[in-house]
Amino acid sequence: MARPDDEVGPAVAPGHPLGKGYLPVPKGAPDGEARLVPQNGPEALNGGPVLDPLVAGAQDGPQALIAAEEETQARLLPAGDGEDVPCPACPPRTALSPRRFVVLLIFSLYSLVNAFQWIQYSSISNVFEDFYEVSPLHINWLSMVYMVAYVPLIFPATWLLDTRGLRLTALLGSGLNCLGAWVKCGSVQRHLFWVTMLGQILCSVAQVFILGLPSPVASVWFGPKEVSTACATAVLGNQLGTAVGFLLPPVLVPALGTQNNTGLLAHTQNNTDLLAHNINTMFYGTAFISTFLFFLTVIAFKEKPPLPPSQAQAILRDSPPEEYSYKSSIWNLCRNIPFVLLLVSYGIMTGAFYSISTLLNQIILTYYVGEEVNAGRIGLTLVVAGMVGSILCGLWLDYTKTYKQTTLIVYVLSFIGMLIFTFTLNLGYIVALFFTGGILGFFMTGYLPLGFEFAVEITYPESEGMSSGLLNTAAQILGIFFTLAQGKITTDYNSPEAGNIFLCAWMFVGIILTALIKSDLRRHNINTGLTNIDVKAVPVDSRVDPKPKAMVSIQSESSL
């Protein structure tokens, strides 16, 4: 639309220097004094530049226009189809890539298979004890090796993620998961327990490159209004694998004793061959699926979208690589008190979940002998309910951004759910455990993505992979401790309730720590334009001023 005459000033004759995009510069004026001044008024909306007063004064009246031909001329960049003028005040361009859903799906699927391989032994622990002729502790170590491997390997894995990127990390996770599945296929003989352990070790190394990726995948590929839901969906893939790990193994590899009408298990060669055949079917099926997903990762999993999906990601992309310090990032996180509190509370909750998942079959069979299939179904119920909880919590966070309140409420409800599950174990009605297990799973498993997203918020602009990796490290360490301690308490006292109460005491400590966390929604403030912070890693107590460059207001959650 053409602007009114009263906005453009005197008419300029065709061929006049002003009409060709030149500005008059008064004699004696220093170089660079003819310039454009940013404008927020009608001229700016209509594309008209506003001149510095020095230049504007040269245009007053026809006399100035005629004299302007004798002055030095300054060439302006065209305002039309020419080269864009850089605008430091303008926000970076962002866009959402349709490929983000493909990347999220691929990651969720190979994470699913990895979680399935973690729990497939524990869900039918009595079957593998008979087949390999080993103790329950040996079978428990097939689960705990995931936790042991994670602790020393998380730091090199996080360094690899931060320096080599998302794609290489994804390829290593998917590839090692595939390799471990094939190694297990060669372990289906009674004397080859060490081979199945080797395959499980490879899968546990793959897990190091998987567990810390939900937050980076969500942040790099998804916009601010969907990042929490995307993170919850990525975590959901791992949870779904655990659910399938509880459901399928009891069906694919049933305990032979349950097929004998006399109730006696005859260790004949035929029974051993049948058991080996069933285990073979499960292992080869897992290997073929893992191989397919690995090739899919190679083909379709890309490093990042062409354009950043959010202002927070755009700022991180513009940060020079040499400004990022891996050691400074770790040091900053370790000195960030709110993050340390979250680190311990997340480790308690997730470690308790790992312990319950590992020992669930033994807990159920203590009171309900021969109910391996139903024990697996209870585990399935626990995890599926948690998947629903994860998605709902992710949607809630995207809508409200109430990270601390939501995390604390879910923590308290998980504690209550654990108490209910504990004191309904010996009622004599296994149906009741489906209900109480579902309550426990809804809140306990639903907490996992909350911890990831809360950590990213209070540690931005530190690497999402670093914060997620440290959270998972705490979870693995406490998971090992809880599994060994709960297993010993349960065995020594022949009482699953005693082991569960042990976990309840620790979860109560986690509630207190969560309540003490000071919430500072740093990433959310960037995405909403409330603040523009320096992305350099600066120690939290450094003498260097770490305050935002520009600040309108900072959003924090109220303390409870």
Curated annotation (Swiss-Prot):
Signal peptide coordinates: none
Organism whose genome encodes this protein: Mus terricolor (Earth-colored mouse)
Transmembrane segments: 93-117, 136-163, 166-185, 193-221, 227-252, 271-300, 337-367, 372-400, 403-425, 429-458, 467-492, 496-518
One GO CC term, this protein: plasma membrane
Presence of the UniProt keyword Phosphoprotein in the record: yes
Record topological domains on the Extracellular side: 118-135, 186-192, 253-270, 368-371, 426-428, 493-495
MF terms (GO), sorted A to Z: choline transmembrane transporter activity; ethanolamine transmembrane transporter activity; heme binding; heme transmembrane transporter activity
Main location: membrane
Glycosylated position list: N270
Protein name per its UniProtKB record: Choline/ethanolamine transporter FLVCR1
Family affiliation: Belongs to the major facilitator superfamily. Feline leukemia virus subgroup C receptor (TC 2.A.1.28.1) family.
Binding locations of choline: Q476
Keyword Transmembrane helix attached: yes
PROSITE patterns: MFS
Any Pfam family hit: MFS_1
Keyword terms, alphabetized: Cell membrane, Erythrocyte maturation, Glycoprotein, Membrane, Phosphoprotein, Receptor, Transmembrane, Transmembrane helix, Transport
